[in-house]
A protein has these predicted regions:
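Glycine-rich flexible loops
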Residues: 1-193
Length: 196
């Protein structure tokens, strides 16, 4: 099996995503560009707690399976599109994290309200319009709206974070959720104060 170390890193990141409540059950996915230009991606509809290194699927740049017996994530086309658009990015994480997703329902961007999100994602995290996830369209909108940011919120869907490596993409997702929770709390206090 090729890339066993990288596959184990993906599984570890997925368990961290569960620990930080960024995903539930089999939702979301992780994709990693290899040093040979192929891609590792988590399988579709499989719970992360039961996933083994061999369950992570190895794909070529066109999305063809090179190694693995599982079906790759339904978001594969979108994620491969993002990799093509952002050559400096080697890791993508897609989550359904609740607070950042909530921001995407009511705002067009999450301002850089905490230093951690500023460092991990950029000055703001834009919100892309809703689109179905099973085609390249989600990747097209995510790339367009993200610009140079290392994260984008997908309206009514979730989040995609990016990094030069898996650690950066994971930190972006965690700090984004922290900032979204803080931002929504501040907005609630502001609204509450207006009604006193």
């Amino acid at each position: 099996m090729k890339y066993e170390k990288e596959r184990r890193e993906i599984l570890s990141a997925a368990l961290d995503m569960l620990q930080y409540s960024l995903i539930s059950l089999s939702g979301g996915n992780i994709a990693l560009r290899t040093d040979e230009g192929s891609f590792l991606i988590t399988p579709s509809a499989m719970r992360y707690e039961t996933m083994l290194p061999e369950d992570v699927v190895l794909l070529d740049a066109e999305g063809r399976v090179l190694e693995g017996c599982r079906r790759p994530s339904s978001d594969t086309k979108a994620l491969l599109y993002l990799f093509r658009q952002r050559s400096e990015i080697n890791a993508l994480i897609h989550t359904h994290q609740p607070y950042a997703t909530a921001v995407g329902l009511v705002e067009d961007e999450l301002p850089g309200c905490l230093v951690t999100v500023l460092d991990a994602c950029g000055p703001c995290v834009p919100v892309a319009p809703f689109t179905i996830s099973s085609d390249e369209g989600m990747g097209v909108l995510a790339a367009e709206y993200a610009g140079e940011s290392l994260a984008v919120i997908l309206r009514s869907h979730g989040v995609i974070t990016m990094g030069r490596n898996l650690s950066e993409a994971l930190e972006a997702a965690i700090y984004l959720e922290e900032a979204a929770r803080t931002y929504l709390a501040a907005r609630a206090l502001e609204i509450g104060r207006a009604h006193v």
